[in-house]
């Protein structure tokens, strides 16, 4: 692990709303989404330095309840907080081998991999750049056809 502070590329939190006659001091988030972006065709991953380990480390850091948002407010995480972790990268043979060690399964289209980690309440998905493009084209096909694009 590098000596400088590591953080995810994108961290999305649900917007908690509480109604009370007392001042809201913040509550635990129900859902946290982490998006990790990697350089296309990167293939220098190791068993200890890869997007899977990186994202799990982010969750472990958040679970310490010592991380703050950009306003300095603590990001409160509880035992029931659900995490959704997405790594956007090319699924190279090396990354595929590492993912299989974590019991990841291939998506039906074989363009990505996924796994649910019960220990940290996290759904983890590795999305290839090709999968994102193919899925977007499928999702928007009717719209593009109607627009004549």
Predicted regions: what they are:
Residues 1-149:
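Charged, terminal alpha-helix-loop-beta segments
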